[in-house]
Amino acid sequence: MDCPRCNVEMESLEGEDISLQRCAECSGVFIDPGDLNRILLRNGLPVLERLGGKANLEEIAVTCPECSVDLTVVEGNDKLGLRYETCESCGGIWLDLELDEDADMQTVETAIVELFRQFRG
């Protein structure tokens, strides 16, 4: 699967009960909503559907690396300008994260948790 930002092959990261695709160039992560919800729940956060946020239908996002549909931008915490992008077709989630090139699954999971803690405001 190619990164929707960089068009380079993303690497698969596998955890105990989670898998995701990560771009080593831009640190973007593509994750299934079920896997994302498992991360959120085990870290004391509500599931994605309960986090809130608002769809920004004006902004054109990248296309889904899974099914090539335009992703919808969801914005939260206006003060910090946080956002994620979601696919209305397959449900996949794209996250722009700041990670080292050699980040492991635990590091990625920690970055995801921090993003969504701040997303709630």
What spans do the regions from the language model cover?
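Short cysteine-rich clusters marking metal-coordination/redox-active sites
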Residues: 3-6, 23-26, 64-67, 87
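A cross-kingdom feature marking solvent-exposed beta-strand/loop segments within repeated
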Residues: 4-21, 46-49, 71-82
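N-proximal short alpha-helices
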Residues: 9, 37-40, 59-60, 73
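A broadly conserved sequence feature marking short terminus-proximal activation segments
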Residues: 18-57
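Short metal-binding segments enriched for Cys and/or His
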Residues: 29-44, 91-107
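Short amphipathic alpha-helical linker/capping segments at the junctions of internal repeats
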Residues: 43-57, 105-121
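Short, solvent-exposed interaction modules
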Residues: 50-96, 101
